[in-house]
Amino acid sequence: MLQVYLVRHGETLWNAARRIQGQSDSALTEKGEQQAYQVGQRVRDLGITHVIASDLGRTRRTAEIIADACGCSVVLDPRLRELNMGVLEQRKLDSLSAEEESWRKALVDGTENGRIPQGESMSEMAQRMRQALDACLSLPENSRPLIVSHGMALGVLVSTILGLPANAERRLRLRNCSISRVDHQQSPWLASGWVVETAGDVSHLEDTALDELQR
């Protein structure tokens, strides 16, 4: 049975400022770097063989810290990027006009073909995220990969594995540097294919998560 660990990147400057990141980028905060270090300490004895990350800076840096603890190198995969938020990227949430907020709401509420202008739909992201996960099936036998990606991207992946619509990710809290795990199994009794073992574990993190403070 293949086990794949899923980690959201550490806290960023734009997370703290409540600014829309999408496929734009901002650096990890000092707290974000510490969160990544705590993930590394949690997983270093789990036999991680591969660290695979979105090629955006915040995931790349998170992955580097974790990979150092595990004695692995980092492989970048652009399919693991966050949702392309189009013309709303880099904007603060409280600066959106009523029309712009309607675009965002249609997208995250699962309106059919909902997307932000110049952006990406949830279903398009779900497709590329599943492709990136399925690529782990081609790794050598006894591999144990760890993927570093983004909040919405990982939420969509976990939701669709469970047979839920992509926009169900809004009901799944994956905090910065949370750890999830999905397994690929073949079973005559249980569901075959990808199954969710855990989602959103933050027991390794020492401080209160930013989104808890901002609720």
Curated annotation (Swiss-Prot):
SUPFAM superfamilies the record matches: Phosphoglycerate mutase-like (SSF53254)
So, what pathway does this thing act in? Carbohydrate degradation; glycolysis; pyruvate from D-glyceraldehyde 3-phosphate: step 3/5
Q: Which major enzyme category is it? A: isomerase
Per the record, its GO cellular-component terms are: cytoplasm
Question: Which key words tag this protein in UniProt?
Answer: Glycolysis, Isomerase
- Per the record, what are the reactions this protein catalyses? (2R)-2-phosphoglycerate = (2R)-3-phosphoglycerate
Q: EC number(s) on record?
A: 5.4.2.-
Q: Where is the active site?
A: H9, E82
> Mind telling me which residues the site (Transition state stabilizer) is annotated on?
H150
Kindly list the biological process annotations in GO that this record carries.
glycolytic process
Please list the residues that bind substrate: 8-15, 21-22, 58, 60, 82-85, 151-152
User: Listed GO molecular functions?
Assistant: phosphatase activity; phosphoglycerate mutase activity
Keyword hit for Ribosomal protein: no
NCBIfam families xref list:
PRK03482.1
Question: Which family, according to the similarity comment?
Answer: Belongs to the phosphoglycerate mutase family. GpmB subfamily.
Entry-linked PANTHER family: BROAD-SPECIFICITY PHOSPHATASE YOR283W-RELATED, HISTIDINE PHOSPHATASE FAMILY PROTEIN-RELATED
What's this protein's name?
A: Probable phosphoglycerate mutase GpmB
* Species the sequence originates in: Erwinia tasmaniensis (strain DSM 17950 / CFBP 7177 / CIP 109463 / NCPPB 4357 / Et1/99)
Its lineage reads: Bacteria, Pseudomonadati, Pseudomonadota, Gammaproteobacteria, Enterobacterales
Q: Which gene encodes it?
A: gpmB
